[in-house]
């Protein structure tokens, strides 16, 4: 199977405190099919993730993959390729602030930002306001719908990244660098006394 999935997960906190994944949503970029997994279906979602040859996500290296590893441990071991749209966005559109003045719908506080929220405005697919109106303590269907919207925005961003035909070597190098920086952030650095 040559399955390429855009993914997003919603958790009950940031990496340092989270202990639960509430839901996962994936989109197969070849078929357009959406896969949605709520708390009682997460094992089924993990099986599909492991089959994918490419996982695409916004901050997938910095958050989603480490969150899956933290919560599921050995149950989640992914060996395929990863494309982080946040890293690609920062690399390809380093001058984002200069470009953002053309987007009348984009709130000025999002100028220059590479967040999925900012990209939602730019791509005409707003995220919604679940984050402002809710906590992430307990799963709800609204949370899964919010996760689906993030996946749709990420998919559109992925298509935009692909259309740029940016240097694959530069993207690969950026991902390798981010991988090691994330390892340092998570594990810390030892100092001689």
Show which residues each predicted segment covers.
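A short, hydrophobic secondary-structure junction motif
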Residues: 30-33, 120-128, 187-188
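Metal-dependent DNA phosphodiester-chemistry modules and their immediately adjacent helices/loops
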Residues: 82-137, 145-152
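Residues at alpha-helix termini
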Residues: 71-72, 123, 164, 187
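Mixed-charge, glycine-rich, non-catalytic linkers/tails in nucleic-acid processing enzymes
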Residues: 80, 88, 128, 133-193
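Short coil/loop linkers at secondary-structure junctions
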Residues: 73-77, 124-126, 190
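Conserved RNase H-like, two-metal-ion catalytic cores of nucleic-acid enzymes
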Residues: 1-111
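Alpha-helical scaffold elements adjacent to nucleotide-binding pockets in ATP/GTP-utilizing enzyme cores
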Residues: 63-71, 115-119, 153-156
